[in-house]
């Protein structure tokens, strides 16, 4: 039986770096999904992350492929906090969350041919009380405009938090490698 091709349905450099830690040969491809068009405001944050991860993986699935799709978002006070896209918006997002707790939701969906395996990690993030000047300094350091919640935990973003409650620290960065590793072991790659 020929070996299946492993595909990461993502152009995220963060997810690519993470997947490389599992030591599988893979290729990264842009998912064939218009993410903005698929965002349904009526869905709960976890359901939305799971839907987007599924759509991304499903868009590239094939019998001879194992395809990984992922999505990550922040749920804060009943609303979704997405990517800021500008430093000013990142500062406002962080100011609104400082001194409070939010959920970082990381969903993955893996298609092994037609077989679907899904997993969601929810991490409780307890942000410190901070001044605007401290937050502005952080945004200058990391420029986290392309990250859900406007922080890069793998860089200086760790200084924003009092406590992080997580089953898998790599989920915070974009892929829950502990669970993904188990899924891929069973995929006979």
Curated annotation (Swiss-Prot):
Site (Important for substrate specificity): 14, 72, 154
EC number(s) reported in the record: 3.6.1.-
Enzyme class: hydrolase
SUPFAM superfamilies, A to Z: ITPase-like
Cystine crosslinks: none
Protein's UniProt keywords contain Transport: no
The protein's required cofactors: a divalent metal cation
Coiled-coil segments on the chain, per record: none
Record's subcellular location: Cytoplasm
Active site: 71
Listed GO CC annotations: cytoplasm
Catalysed reactions, semicolon-separated: N(7)-methyl-GTP + H2O = N(7)-methyl-GMP + diphosphate + H(+)
GO biological process, alphabetically ordered: nucleotide metabolic process
Gene3D superfamilies, sorted: 3.90.950.10
UniProt xrefs under InterPro entries: ITPase-like_fam, Maf-like
One Pfam family cited in the UniProt record for this chain: Maf
Top-level taxon of the source organism: Bacteria
GO molecular function, one term: nucleoside triphosphate diphosphatase activity
Keywords, alphabetical: Cytoplasm, Hydrolase, Nucleotide metabolism
Stored HAMAP family: Maf
Free-text function comment from the UniProt entry: Nucleoside triphosphate pyrophosphatase that hydrolyzes 7-methyl-GTP (m(7)GTP). May have a dual role in cell division arrest and in preventing the incorporation of modified nucleotides into cellular nucleic acids.
Family: Belongs to the Maf family. YceF subfamily.
Name of the protein in question: 7-methyl-GTP pyrophosphatase
């Amino acid at each position: 039986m020929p070996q299946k091709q492993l595909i990461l349905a993502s152009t995220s450099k963060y997810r690519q770096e993470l997947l490389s830690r599992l030591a599988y040969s893979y290729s990264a491809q842009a998912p064939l999904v218009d993410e903005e068009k698929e965002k349904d405001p009526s869905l709960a944050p976890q359901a939305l992350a799971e839907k987007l991860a599924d759509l991304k993986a499903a868009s590239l699935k094939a019998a001879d492929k194992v395809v990984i799709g992922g999505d990550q978002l922040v749920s804060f006070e009943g609303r979704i906090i997405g990517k800021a896209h500008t430093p000013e918006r990142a500062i406002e997002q962080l100011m609104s969350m400082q001194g409070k707790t939010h959920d970082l939701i990381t969903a993955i969906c893996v298609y092994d041919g037609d077989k679907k395996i899904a997993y969601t990690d929810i991490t409780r993030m307890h942000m410190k009380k901070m001044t605007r000047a401290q937050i502005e300094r952080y945004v200058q350091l990391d420029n986290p405009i392309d990250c859900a919640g406007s922080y890069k935990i793998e860089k200086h973003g760790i200084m924003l938090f009092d406590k992080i409650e997580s089953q898998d620290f790599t989920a915070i960065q974009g892929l829950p490698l502990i669970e993904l590793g188990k899924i891929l072991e069973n995929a006979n790659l």
